[in-house]
Amino acid sequence: MNYKIICYLLFLLLGFAIIFMATVVKAQPLPGTCYTARVVRIIDGDTITVYDNAGCFHRIRLAMIDAPEKEQPFGAEATNALSELLKEGTVSLKVHCIDKYNREVAFVNCDGKDVSAEMLRKGMAMHYHMDFDNCEIYDKFEEAAKRHRQGLWAQDNIETPWDYRHNLAKRRHSNVHKDLFQA
């Protein structure tokens, strides 16, 4: 009888160990880490999910740009433009930092092209200034797109993605207060 109980407990322990090992999350790469991965999802015009050679998924925010949100004018176009740039599927990444949403902010290259620079050049994103050397090239791509009224720069009244998010949060907060007083 004791033998059966011991075997049962060992079996349970083994099961828990397997479950624990399966749920262990790989630590995120440190800034400066470079790796190659396959793009598995385009979330929006500046965020993707990749699958690396070690079998881990990573949520990536493209460094140096901020694309319109999906609900904004040119949001869908920015997402489609990023999808077109990444159609080869394999990218090389260099991690710059981890953002407050736990995404890797990374420089992404596909088919020999800096994806952030290409999004700026096409007018599908705005330059998001970061603490990084050699940012001037990103300013130049954005300025050229503005001059030629490419992509989102064809609009007359442009709301930046960061202003859009800020204003959306204010509207949501305002609506919550309205609902409380109307109840």
Where are the regions that the model predicts?
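Small beta-barrel nucleic-acid-binding modules, primarily SNase/OB-fold domains
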Residues: 2-183
